[in-house]
UniProtKB/Swiss-Prot annotation:
GO cellular component: plasma membrane
Protein name: Conjugal transfer protein TraG
InterPro entries, alphabetized: P-loop_NTPase, T4SS-coupling_protein, TraG/VirD4
Disulfide bond annotation, renumbered to this chain: none
Length: 637
């Protein structure tokens, strides 16, 4: 049995195997027919094409006529028939020998393997359509009925220019997440963020540095996308909404302790580095008890518990701190009985030595110092909306989280609390019908998180990317480079899973080699043919003695790191404003990489008109529900 070598790699594994060539069998059959034709014509020529031989066309007879003549006249003309047969055998033999030689030559010839060292290539239009970033062409039924092909929807992930210079927007409408690498001042806002927010009609959460996105997109989203637009700017008095994180605690249910523990973790770990020190861990335990105590006491007094009130409770100058521990340990929180989590936290503080207890208290108060700012305290004193309303309100809701550059660092703990609660509270349950999940929300939610790593490590975000798409949440994460994401100090570390859970990745020309190397690996390896010319002969001779050319298949990255670094960026004027788009690359899992073109919203008259709609001067406010979501059974002591 002949052993067949397995040279299939890459796409060849899934492609249909080529069928054996039928050329040589056809040539062999033609040789046999040619022999019959030669014998027939030789015999007819011998008898001067006599009419008795039968019908012909220009003295040309059917090839099989010699067989009929042999049966009919062999006894009368044996010599003539033998001569005709010899002529036919000669012609057939020559033809079959030629076929045999061709078979030997083709069998001993090597077959080129264009995927030997890699099969990476740039995507063509059909690849981009298959990836879902371009609308498909109209089918036959749509052409006959005059219907248009489905239009593209979803978020903008880039642009693409065909060979004729036609520009197409690339949009992704699936539930999968998007990760963007774009250095500062590279045009990601005018190319990706603004077009997306000027076309996405469902709910959204937007981190907005300096309020630029609010100014450019809130007007259209409110007036034409029929969104309720909320501006949450904790350090401003300019008419934004207020939000109290403690209103989201599901007080009186079995979830209350977990909710408060999640909140306290974010308070004492503002950078997402983990609770490593003894003081962080003890301050965390203390804050869990104090926050729960403040919630129950405010409920009984008919007031509202807030983070500023928690800070005031710990820093009350007119009350000895020991009185607070005693109150927490004896207060009847639930049905006249003391809450076990609150009492335990108070007894821990009473059992500690005075010096240690003072250090724990000081650590806890230091994490609440942000809420001593009267502006911030006012903006977290009540709730003009609830997290659940982002996806469950009758109208879609757009929440802009606005921070000014000079307040960005100090407000980060509060922003982290909000993002954490959005993910945790909106991805809490899933309904099924007929073995399939069904949407329990009214509107999908887009989380447009610009400068995502600047929020610090949000472990819930990293873990939840794998499943929040099933709850109608689509994340669009933007970072400056791969180092910012993989940093061990401020990011998610080398073994992060953010990139693993983002189906689409796109990138503007990077500034760091590490990002360029990452993009080069994403693009893949390809096979190219290298030509080598060898010459021989005397240097002083008029002509060289011999010139030989050899061809070799070699491997190279489809996009090398230095080529990635040298991708054309956007062209800017003297004022630093972008005038012409640069290049970019887009990666969709399972499809060839796309060498694209950056979109610019101000080059599109539709987007320019939408961006010109003035933003509302005052934020919308939603109807605040009377109590936090109390799903679940009440707890008992």
């Amino acid at each position: 049995m002949k052993i067949k070598m397995n040279n299939a790699v890459g796409p060849q594994v899934r492609t249909a195997k080529p069928k054996p060539s039928k050329l040589l069998p056809v040539l062999g059959a033609a040789s046999m027919v040619g022999g019959l034709q030669a014998a027939t014509q030789f015999f007819a020529h011998t008898f001067a094409y006599h009419a008795t031989l039968g019908p012909n066309v220009g003295h040309v007879y059917a090839p099989w006529s010699i067989l009929h003549w042999t049966y009919k006249w062999y006894s009368q003309y044996p010599d003539e028939i033998m001569k005709a047969g010899s002529m036919g055998m000669l012609v057939s033999t020559v033809g079959l020998l030629g076929v045999a030689v061709a078979k030997v030559v083709t069998s001993n010839s090597s077959k080129a393997n264009e995927y030997l060292h890699g099969s990476a290539r740039w995507a063509e239009k059909k690849d981009i359509q298959a990836a879902g970033l371009l609308p498909r062409e109209r089918n036959v039924l749509e052409i006959v009925t005059g219907k248009a092909a489905p239009t593209a929807t979803g978020v903008y992930v880039g642009g693409w220019q065909d060979k004729d210079g036609n520009f197409f927007y690339l949009r992704h409408s699936g539930p999968e997440h998007v990760l963007t690498y774009a250095p500062t001042r590279s045009g990601k806002g005018v190319g990706l963020v603004v077009p997306t927010l000027l076309s996405w009609g469902a709910s959204s959460v937007i981190t907005d540095l300096k309020g630029e996105l609010w100014a450019l997109t809130a007007g259209w989203r409110q007036k034409h996308a029929k969104n309720k637009v909320l501006r949450f700017e904790p350090a401003s008095t300019s008419g934004g909404v207020c939000w109290n994180p403690l209103d989201e605690i599901r007080l009186g249910t079995e979830y209350e302790v977990g909710d408060v523990q999640n909140l306290a973790t974010l308070i004492v770990d503002p950078d997402g580095k983990g609770l490593d020190s003894h003081w962080q861990k003890t301050a965390f335990a203390l804050l869990v008890g104090v926050i729960l105590h403040a919630l129950y006491k405010a409920k009984d007094d008919g007031g509202t518990a807030t983070l500023p009130s928690v800070d005031a409770m710990l820093a009350d100058p007119n009350r000895d701190i020991g009185e607070l521990w005693m109150e927490m340990a004896t207060y009847g929180h639930v049905d006249g009985q003391n809450h076990h989590a609150i009492g335990s936290a108070a007894r821990d503080m009473m059992d500690r030595p005075e010096e240690e207890a003072g250090s724990v208290l000081s650590t806890a108060k230091s994490y609440l110092a942000l809420y001593r700012d009267p502006v911030v305290a006012r903006n977290v004193s009540r709730s003009d909306f609830r997290i659940k309303q982002l996806m469950h309100e009758d109208d879609p809701v757009s929440l802009y989280i606005v921070t000014q550059p000079n307040d960005k660092a100090r407000l980060r703990p509060l922003v982290r609390v909000m993002v954490n609660m959005i993910v945790r509270l909106l991805a809490d349950k899933m309904d099924f019908e007929g073995g399939r999940p069904v949407a329990h929300y009214k509107h999908r939610l887009l989380m447009m998180l610009d400068e995502f790593p600047s929020l610090g490590k949000l472990e819930i975000m990293q873990e939840s990317l794998a499943f929040v798409a099933g709850y109608g949440i689509k994340c669009y994460l933007i970072c400056q480079d791969i180092n910012q994401l993989k940093s061990r100090e401020t990011g998610y570390g080398h073994d992060e899973s953010i990139t693993s859970n983002c189906h689409v990745q796109n990138a503007y020309p990077p500034n760091r080699v590490e990002t360029a190397e990452h993009l080069s690996r994403l693009t893949g390896q390809t096979t190219v043919v290298k030509e080598q010319i060898t010459t021989s002969g005397r240097r002083t001779a008029a002509m060289l003695g011999q010139v030989s050319r050899t061809y070799q298949e070699v491997q190279r990255p489809l996009l090398t790191p230095d080529e990635c670094l040298r991708m054309p960026g956007p062209k800017k004027n003297a004022q630093g404003e972008i005038e012409e788009a640069g290049d970019m690359v887009i990666y969709v899992a399972g499809y060839p990489a796309i060498y694209g073109k950056q979109p610019l919203y101000f080059k599109d008259p539709v987007f320019s008109a939408r961006a010109a709609i003035p933003a509302p001067k005052v934020s919308d406010r939603l109807r605040a529900v009377a109590q936090a979501d109390t799903e679940g059974e009440g707890i008992t002591i």
